[in-house]
Amino acid sequence: MFALTDKVIGNLQMATFAAFGGFATLVLSSFAGTRREKLAAHAALAVAGSVLLTIGTAVTSSTALAAIVTLPVTFAVFFAGIAGPNAASGSTGALLAYVLPAASPGTISMVPDRLAGWWLASIAGTAAVLALSPRPGEDRLRADASQLAAGLADLLDAALGGAATEARLGDAMAAKHELITRFTATPYRPTGLATPDEALANIVELLEWCTTLVADTIRERADLRNASRQERDLLEAAGSVLHDVATLLADGRTVPDLDRLERCRAESLAWLGQLTPERPGFRAAARLSFHADTIAGVVLATGAAALVARGLADPEWIATTRSRWHHGPATARLQRPRRRILSLAAVARRDASVRSVWFISSLRGAIALAAAVAVADLSSVQHGFWVVLGALSVLRTNAASTGSTALRALAGTAIGFVIGGALLVAIGSDSTALWVALPIAVFVAAYAPGTAPFAIGQAAFTVTIAVLFNLLAPVGWKVGVLRIEDVAIGCAVSVLAGILFWPRGLSSLVGDDLADTFRAGASYLTQAIEWASGSRTGEPDGGTATITAALRLDDALRAFLTEQGTKHIGKQELWRLVGGSMRLRLTAHLVAGLPRDATGMGAARDALSHRTGTLVAWYERLAELVGKPRGKPVADLEPPAFGPVDVVKVGSGSHYGIWLCEHLDHLSEGLDELVPPASRLAEIRRRPWWR
């Protein structure tokens, strides 16, 4: 396209935007999914780029106007990444269509030529992607989820047959770790806003928790041959559904029998209700019933999510499930386009907070780029575009990592200048040699990101630009010197923005979001226990807040783990804290869905209330530990201690109260493991940001 527009058509504006449009389409943006999904993503990039290009050209005549308009425009582009991985991956390419005209001289009359170049590059680039991209490989995330579901089903079958072993349990735990590692290996949540994507994300979370529940059951009672018929039937039905989920996720069409699992669960609860608390072995039976019912509840949700993920549930049921995840019953029967709009609006509301990594990163990026546009114009550099691109290329989530990246960017640019300058001196004015060198330079620049160090990518890009600009307007090696100067200015702007607006970056946000998840989960647990024990008249309504906090934490943690620089805290320590918050939230969710007993609790209600209060107070202290330091030293935190008043006694006469107490008892296990990583995070938050 560059050769066509430069040599055949002979239009400088068209050639420039064809060249950089190709970079935006093929180098800066990488879309995943099927060919249809890639086509839709590239089409959206082309349309968005056209709008941004027009706006950028319109504001370039005024420094103040360009800087002011850059703030909302770049914020909107960055923030649009909440829609999914492809939207996030296309943000830099879309911004290139804006910053190139906004930071370069031009008039509104140039818009048609620039759009023509942009669309030529978009069409050619999209065609190349669709024609030359390899066939989509196996969906490894779905495959890993299928493998874990099958492993859990086999483990339950083995326990029912008295053949559960530590080796089988170890295999299941290894499969869980592999699934979570793959799910968390990308900077963006590997699912979008579509209902099947949401369902797959839920499956990952549910299977992780189900693994913990099954492991706890096996470790407590590995041989279930002597369990009651009702509990055996329930666990056998749960294993059958897990087998069907595994087949379904592996492209099968088997529909899990959720109705049978529901019936077995109801029979198990009814059987437990017929037992008297004074009966020998009642507490052991109640504990096994708790394990079986908890596993069944999680497996039911997993089976439902699998049906949605594979598109086998009817639209009405999908809508109801979707509303339960994000909105509420009011949106259950809306038509699909409107549900899509409301879903986007709900996610936007969720992330419109200083607790959201999307909001804070978008705001910081917008301020840095607006400042870069203003500095580029006021400093009268020859190529202001490079100032803005320099700022964009080194933006990171904290000042220290931005500064580190800035140094690598300058080093890479200097290396590229030396190589490019030597190449131009050797080639001289031979345009044929430059045309031969251009595709080689482009190949290296496109291949380097993700496969070579950041500085190497910067060097390759500088060589490409040196060759490209000498084809457009021969100036020899001087273009390299100019780019070093401009990139240095842009890097300085990004570093300054990082110091002023977000010096600590994501480490502080991860702590704040962890605190929010623990507080929201503790509040939801209180509501759930009060509802199930009959002391609350209204149904629990804290579920939405816990989901919002969990999703914000997920986004912040992904960005933190993919951020360059020293972390000072291990990934496993962070995931132990995240797992603790998830266990709290899902326990509250499960209790909130249990039958309500408003009359038969008796003295058990006071014990449950006291035990819940002790747990909630501990989670509040944990949230305070990982939250904002507020000038306080790191406080010692001991696991909660429960006294006689916190235990529902067998003599209370309430089998349901004893059963609910098992939920709280299970949640209390392992809380001491959360203290060391929480204290470590608290210490990090109290260090100076530059350390």
Regions found by a protein language model. Name each.
Residues 4, 8, 30-31, 132-370, ...:
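Long, hydrophobic alpha-helical segments that serve as membrane-spanning/inserting helices
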Residues 579:
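Active-site-adjacent mobile loop/cap segments within catalytic or ligand-binding domains
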Residues 497:
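Active-site acid/base region of carbohydrate-active enzymes
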Residues 1-128, 132-133, 303-459, 465, ...:
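Alpha-helical transmembrane segments and their membrane-interface boundaries
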